[in-house]
Amino acid sequence: MIYDHILVRYGELTLKGANRKIFVNKLRSNVKLALMPLQGYTVKANRDRMYIELDEGADIEEMCNRLKKVFGIYSISPVLKIEKTVEAVNELAVRFAKEYADGDTFKIDVKRSDKNFPYDTYALQRTVGGAVLDATNHLSVDVHNPDHNIKVEVRLDAIYMYDQVIEGSGGLPVGTGGKTLLMLSGGIDSPVAGIEVMRRGVTVEAIHFHSPPFTSEKAKEKVIELTRILSGHVGPIKLHIVPFTDLQKQVNKVVHERYTMTSTRRMMMRVADKVVHDIDAHAIVNGENLGQVASQTLKSMYAINHVTSTPVLRPLLTLDKEDIVKKAKEIGTFDVSIQPYEDCCTIFTPKNPITEPDIEKVEKYEIGYDFEPLVQQAVDGIETLLITSDYQSEKDTATQALADDLF
């Protein structure tokens, strides 16, 4: 079937009132950004839905794959726009039906927003269903659980027909909910946390703490790849890579071994707090999950949070690990996250870390050394990369150039 439009149904933004236009306009911009590399389409949005007009030869499959990742979209359907006659509806319904397998069932589902159309909803359903049965001998009707649902939308300008509904990502358009800084470790949890806040319309920049030579270049490349996957949902993402070696080594010199994990995370939070203000963000996001590891007890979180007044969002706080893994697999980050490259959270891990840290004790250990210059040094040394869905590292680019020269 050759379609001429893609119908985009809005998600939660349909609940908005006077400010709905802001959300629709942002979603339209995000859709254009997602489709930008492709050709042969025009995006038209109104208050209730969006239509993408397709030129001949447009890559509908690739467009749908991109659109279903855009937050704010409830579902999409490739559709055909036809003239407002019963004959045209019958003809197209029969074309749909002839592609179905022997023994399949179908249903005709009509929505009629144009009340001046000469057939009411039920009369049109009966007429079109009868036309399909008359023209085929391999199908039967099932109005409760059909294999195929042929949908007919009678609107003021035309009739739109389709038989596919592709689930979207839901949520709100990214860019309507402020900006956050995502602490991206390289593990399973933090990319999922990033997706969850982006689903609520929040723009994300990411921060990663890199401690060479204790963490390898492979660990850095892993985080870049995770950011690249996330950017497939929202467009380019800034990744701030923090040189954390000196700060982490000093923590391990002056802080009691059982408290080094708590203190290390406090230093990360101090760096992140400065970056939040530099990029004009409004919160810090991490992938912490209550009780999952020693640093994720309530007392640990309290001790770590104590160094910042910036809100810290934890979208995964109460989820089971199995649910987080499932989400990671769905968004495509799981296989990257489990690559066995250590990050700065796993090096120098004490054998018996404190799980219920006393905030007065950790402050006592830290007060013996002025960490502020090292914190500022880490901020000043940040490397910022703009990661897109087709991002290639300098190493990858050089390798590709060499291959092109050789072959």
Curated annotation (Swiss-Prot):
Stated family: Belongs to the ThiI family.
Biological role stated in the UniProt entry: Catalyzes the ATP-dependent transfer of a sulfur to tRNA to produce 4-thiouridine in position 8 of tRNAs, which functions as a near-UV photosensor. Also catalyzes the transfer of sulfur to the sulfur carrier protein ThiS, forming ThiS-thiocarboxylate. This is a step in the synthesis of thiazole, in the thiamine biosynthesis pathway. The sulfur is donated as persulfide by IscS.
GO molecular function, one term: ATP binding
Reaction catalysis annotation: [ThiI sulfur-carrier protein]-S-sulfanyl-L-cysteine + a uridine in tRNA + 2 reduced [2Fe-2S]-[ferredoxin] + ATP + H(+) = [ThiI sulfur-carrier protein]-L-cysteine + a 4-thiouridine in tRNA + 2 oxidized [2Fe-2S]-[ferredoxin] + AMP + diphosphate; [ThiS sulfur-carrier protein]-C-terminal Gly-Gly-AMP + S-sulfanyl-L-cysteinyl-[cysteine desulfurase] + AH2 = [ThiS sulfur-carrier protein]-C-terminal-Gly-aminoethanethioate + L-cysteinyl-[cysteine desulfurase] + A + AMP + 2 H(+)
Protein name, as recorded: Probable tRNA sulfurtransferase
Entry keyword annotation includes tRNA-binding: yes
PROSITE patterns assigned: THUMP
Superkingdom classification of source: Bacteria
The THUMP domain, residue ranges: 61-165
GO BP term, example: thiamine diphosphate biosynthetic process
Keywords: ATP-binding, Cytoplasm, Nucleotide-binding, RNA-binding, Thiamine biosynthesis, Transferase, tRNA-binding
GO CC annotations on file: cytosol
Pathway: Cofactor biosynthesis; thiamine diphosphate biosynthesis
Assigned EC number: 2.8.1.4
Cellular compartment(s): Cytoplasm
InterPro entries in UniProt: Rossmann-like_a/b/a_fold, ThiI_AANH, ThiI_fer, ThiI_N, THUMP_dom, THUMP_ThiI, tRNA_STrfase, tRNA_sulfurtransferase_ThiI
Pfam families, sorted: ThiI, ThiI_fer, THUMP
Keyword Nucleotide-binding appears in the UniProt entry: yes
Binding residues annotated for ATP, in chain numbering: M183, L184, H208, F209, R265, G287, Q296
